[in-house]
Structure formats: C-alpha cells, structure tokens
Amino acid sequence: ASSGLSDAPIRWIVDDCAKFVEREIRRGRKYDAVIMDPPSYGRGPSGEIWKLEENLFPFVELVTGVLSDEPLFFLINSYTTGLAPSVLTYLLETLVSRKYGGRTESQELGLPVTATGLALPCGATGRWTAE
C-alpha cells in the first residue's frame, strides 16, 4: 500500500457498522481513534433504512461506547450537502467533548472550481482531538 500503513494495526470496517460496534461493546473492546464516513442514505440487507439526518446522532452516541479511556481523536466526514459543519460540532461537543474534554472543530468541504476560483460546497467534516 502506498500509504505505508499495510502493517499498521488498523481495522477497516465496511460492514454494518452499528452491528459491529454493538459486538465490540459486548466484547469490551476499546479504540483510541474513530474515523467515520457515513452515507447520506442506505438500505441494509433486511430492508433497514439509514438516513444520516435521523441516524447520525444515535450512531455517534453508540460509537462513543468503544472509545478508550484516553482517546486520541474522532473524525466524521459527510458528503451530505445539507449537513452544516455546526451540526458536527454539536454532535462532537455533546457526545465526546463533555466526557473527554479536548477540542472540537468543523468546517465545510468544497471542491475547487478552476473557472471561477470558488469552491463548490460538497459536505462537512468535524474533528474532536484530545489536548
């Protein structure tokens, strides 16, 4: 891998993440960092429906259950154009910062448009980091 991380202890989860997190909580496993890039909309194999606007808060709340006692960071990327960075700030402040302290920041994601020199909004990112 060109990233140089092929031997690093990283678990890439592309399955039903909520079920994975629930299993990890039952097993007592903990993680120092979380990177999530949830879809705007999706359907599970049994017809379950995922809508970012409805499911992100409870999912982030669930995921905090696998954070270690001294986590390093929690990153959320979203390419849902209607999701403001302030929503990610609220989620991370409410669910992570209140428990662990640290610092939260969020910003809009954009694609540069060469012809205009402007950026085309395409989502938001939010990051909590320990201090």
What do these predicted ranges mean?
Residues 1-35:
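S-adenosyl-L-methionine
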Residues 13-17, 59, 84, 88:
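General structural feature for long, well-ordered alpha-helical segments within catalytic domains
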Residues 14, 31-62:
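Mobile active-site "lid"/loop adjacent to the S-adenosyl-L-methionine
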Residues 16-18, 40, 80:
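Active-site-proximal loop/turn and secondary-structure-junction residues that shape catalytic pockets
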Residues 22, 43, 83:
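Conserved protein kinase catalytic core
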Residues 25-26, 46-49, 87-89:
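Short amphipathic alpha-helical segments
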Residues 64-69:
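A short, conserved beta-to-alpha structural element at the edge of catalytic cores
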Residues 70-131:
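C-terminal catalytic and target-recognition region of SAM-dependent MTase-like enzymes
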